[in-house]
Amino acid sequence: MTDTSAPGDAGGFERRARQNQAERRANLETTYDFIICGAGSSGSVVARRLAENPACTVLLIEAGPDDEAESVLDPALWPANLGTDRDWGFQAEPNPHLDGRALSMSMGKGLGGGSSVNVMVWARGHRSDWDHFAAETGDPAWNYASVLDIYRRVENWQGQPDAKYRGTNGPVWVQPAKDPSLIAGALLDAAEALGVPRFDHPNGEMMEGVGGVAYADMLVREGRRHSLYRAYVRPIADYPNLTILTETVVRRVLFDGRRAIGVEIERAGSISPIKASAEVVISTGAINTPKLLMLSGVGDRDELARLGIPVVQHLPGVGRNLQDHVSFGCTWEYREPLAPRNSGSEATLYWKSRPDLTAPDLLFCQVEFPVPSERTALLGVPNHGWTMFAGLAQPHSRGRIRLKSADPSEMPVVDANMLSDPRDLEAARACVKLCREIGSSDAFRPFVSAERIPGTGRQIDDAFIRDAAVTYWHQCGTAKMGSDDMSVVDAKLAVHGIAGLRIADGSVLPRVTTGNTQAPCAIVGERAADLMRRQYRL
């Protein structure tokens, strides 16, 4: 391990951290103050903030491996993680709204979670997202103004100074795409020519109005991925009060009545309980979090009874409200090959499908290599080209997570249900139309020879949209915040009706945010940690 916050002592820190964690793992306690399930974009934040108090003992449990792999650390190699042991590899059910297609639903597995396998884009979400969360929870601490304060606190911004929106003293190294590709610059020029406003960065004024275009903000430091695990947990891996377990599965939460008292884990083939004297925090993502809740007896009583799981708390919203950004890629062939730079995704665009909208409902992420679906690949994939990963930022369709059985080793049933709402199909048509206008504009002519997918001259119909649809892997919403009957947690992220159990990950978001989701998940982690430190006077 290398403490990136103190490069001068890298060797000494590495030795201390490795020795410390080896000792912690070899001498596991039977009880910790706090147990955090999942070392992803939210769980890493919670673990760091709690462990900053030396009086707290913190156990951070991760199902996947460590992050010491070139496929993780080299920004250009992120696609190499998909379909490996660093990917949960979920598969959605066949969807009648996609002509029976069953989409792959990748999710990061390992230290850093999604922030160790994604394209490293830092996107805060739109003002309207956070104000919606405040309205849903009745708590102004979730509104845009409050969250902006947290963003400034956590960022170590490396771009042009902007004190109104950016912070420079936090743990998260955020930088503009360094030396971006000419094709990324062409996207900015093309969008601006079509009337889309251009901004210096995408995480300030651009996310307060109708949208815009900018070079992406990225979590890349000195040419290496700067995951949220590396930002928050890695620099404190030598703390004696922090234990990090990898390749350890949390099978269920343990209860005494309606109080969470620990977890049951499986590690190296052995199953054992570990107690939490204060709280258990679930941060396992929008597919695994509802799975873990239901396996533990928290969910819809009828569903649990069907599987023979004793009911601890009836919460019918567990697993409901599944949302994800859905994309419809269009691909162009290069005149001459252009090698991807950084992560291969350096420019981002948010816009609206209808003139009357006051916030963007479309999301465009440029990918500097071809990314077709398995269906649209049949149209012909160029050897050298780029794809506009054009999608719905605010989909109306909702899916669901269900248990297949009471066996923790079984994958859950993922009913993604994309494009089930007719409004999404209407927005998708506008999305693909704008995508093609941009890619076929004057700005791209020096670089592009032809549109290959869907193909020059082809009229866009609903069949193409259903064939092209793929997921951004931004699953959210399956344990949402709020006070209605379908809410799972309150504004403090505590599970309704349960003591000592909190959720901190993208599953608590009432709706998916506008843009990539790792930054909002970091905010969820910061909010959870703030609330816990206040409650326990840490």
Language-model-detected regions and their locations in the chain:
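N-terminal redox-cofactor-binding region of secreted/periplasmic oxidoreductases
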Residues: 1-538
